[in-house]
């Protein structure tokens, strides 16, 4: 069973979280804490697999508690917060939390949210907290002479920090447009864009239907919309779709990758990073089969080795690299 510690100053919230966890036999609540200081003590006492962490609490907030826990007793932390403090939630992710999930109105009749909530906790429980990075020189064999017109990045659990690390050294004049599909909830996409903008030199915005992607610009798929593209005289225009979810996900990486394969073929560079599940595996294979280039994050640096693994097992990977080398390879390709 997955051992869960609930941290929230609201007794009502704690009770409802317990009820949601009780709908599955996969989870065991090993403790409840009502402020950040208590959460540190309970973490050391109960040794949970996952901590569900609120942000706004007395004594010590969830942000400071996350920093201390990740320093003293690293544990998978799922930030469970309201939209008005979502920006702080991404700071918590930067401090080491695995994922973020907005609090609903606690309507237990919403089975979809309950399933999403349980999926997030299960995904967090699989997180690799001590990731290894190799900062060595990029080998010549890892380079490619292909020229690309679009970079498409797909990720889920652990994605915000992975993308931040990937893009942090990209110059503002990076010569290729970048599209990102990050599994994200409604109400949090704009906060994600704002946070990512503060972490890199490139322009970052939510993708807009009909927009022409520009070099040095990052376009993020909005929550609950698939990001696709269609051919145009300029190369392509971005499209947002309400097509059904894939793997219960919208936006889905598979949808973006398959669209990129159709429009750009061999001119597409795809990157599949950390995340639970198989989303992106089929789409990555489509890009590879069309002549494009697919980079998959290796197991050693993935927070959750699921999506990247699916692509590798499908035979879609052109290169399998640790996170820090992916950024170096993309920059090397762009400079050529």
For each predicted feature, which ranges?
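Conserved acid/base catalytic micro-environments in cytosolic active-site loops
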Residues: 2-5, 11-22, 26, 37-45, ...
């Amino acid at each position: 069973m997955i051992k869960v510690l609930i941290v929230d100053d609201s007794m009502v919230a704690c009770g409802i979280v317990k009820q949601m966890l009780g709908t599955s036999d996969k989870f065991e609540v090993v403790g409840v804490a009502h402020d950040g200081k208590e959460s540190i003590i309970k973490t050391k006492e109960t040794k949970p697999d996952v901590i569900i962490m609120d942000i706004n609490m007395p004594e010590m907030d969830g942000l400071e508690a996350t920093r201390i826990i990740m320093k003293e007793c690293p544990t998978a932390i799922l930030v469970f917060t309201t939209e008005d403090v979502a920006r702080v939630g991404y700071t918590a992710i930067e401090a080491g939390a695995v994922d973020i999930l907005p609090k609903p109105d606690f309507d237990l009749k919403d089975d979809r949210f309950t399933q999403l909530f349980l999926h997030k906790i299960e995904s967090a429980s699989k997180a690799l907290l001590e990731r290894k990075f190799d900062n060595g020189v990029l080998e010549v064999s890892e380079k490619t002479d292909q020229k690309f017109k679009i970079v498409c990045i797909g990720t889920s659990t652990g994605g915000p920090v992975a993308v931040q690390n990937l893009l942090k050294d990209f110059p503002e004049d990076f010569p290729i447009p970048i599209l990102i599909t990050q599994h994200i909830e409604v109400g949090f996409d704009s906060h994600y864009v704002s946070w990512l903008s503060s972490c890199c030199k490139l322009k970052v915005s939510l993708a807009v239907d009909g927009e022409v992607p520009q070099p040095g610009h990052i376009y993020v798929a909005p929550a609950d919309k698939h990001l696709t593209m269609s051919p145009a005289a300029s190369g392509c225009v971005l499209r947002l779709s309400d097509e059904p979810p894939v793997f219960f996900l919208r936006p889905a990486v598979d949808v973006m990758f398959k669209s990129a394969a159709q429009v750009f073929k061999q001119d597409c560079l795809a990157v599949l990073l950390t995340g639970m599940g198989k989303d992106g595996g089929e789409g990555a294979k489509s890009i590879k089969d069309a002549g494009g280039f697919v980079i998959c994050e290796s197991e050693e640096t993935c927070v959750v080795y699921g999506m990247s693994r699916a692509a590798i097992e499908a035979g879609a990977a052109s290169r399998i690299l640790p996170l820090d080398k992916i950024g170096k390879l993309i920059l090397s390709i762009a400079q050529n």
